[in-house]
A protein has these predicted regions:
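Nucleic-acid nuclease catalytic cores
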Residues: 96, 135-153
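Active-site ExK catalytic segment of metal-dependent nucleases
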Residues: 106-118, 125
């Protein structure tokens, strides 16, 4: 309340205290499965632990709780893909080097884009794979809202098929 009113005094000690409170708050949200965080992929575990975290919500409904209620289909789709991958991947990370890869799960790299009809968007998504994995050690997958195709070595999967692919895997195991 004080922060919203803008009348709270600031000091180094209060800033440190504020950081501690926020961390405890974030931990509470994580402990209660409202938010989840993933680390940036790195070959050294200490670097991975120190990396900036990406935050995802356990339910897209929480995206409507904020002040800014404009619908961002790309953010919602990426969050939904996270929810699915988080159920099935033992070590889910993202990659941030020159370009960002949304998810790394075992032997697959995932990019999420609501729509890749625009050539610039398509090239941006493809370039991220090429930049990180020049040796082609991973399977490349782009999850979109409504497109399915195979382009070069990249599988483009519509979200609906992506979900069923993982559900079928779950039934087999």
């Amino acid at each position: 309340f004080d922060e919203a009113c803008g009348n709270r005094p600031k000091s180094k000690d209060s800033d440190d205290f504020e950081k501690i409170l926020f961390l405890k708050e974030e931990d509470n949200f994580e402990d209660n499965f409202l938010i989840h965080t993933i680390s940036s992929y790195h070959t050294k575990i200490t670097e991975q632990i120190k990396s900036a975290k990406k935050v995802y919500l356990s339910d897209n409904g929480f995206l409507n709780l904020g002040i800014n209620r404009t619908i961002n289909n790309g953010v919602m789709l990426e969050n939904e893909v996270f929810v699915v991958l988080n159920k099935f991947c033992e070590e889910l990370t993202y990659i941030k080097e020159n370009y960002e890869i949304d998810f790394r799960c075992e032997n697959s790299l995932y990019q999420v884009s609501y729509n890749i009809e625009d050539e610039k968007t398509r090239q941006r998504e493809f370039r991220a794979f090429e930049n990180f994995d020049s040796e082609k050690r991973y399977k490349y997958k782009i999850i979109t809202y409504d497109e399915t195709s195979l382009s070069e070595d990249i599988e483009i999967i519509k979200y609906e098929d992506f979900i069923f692919e993982f559900e079928d895997t779950k039934r087999i195991n």
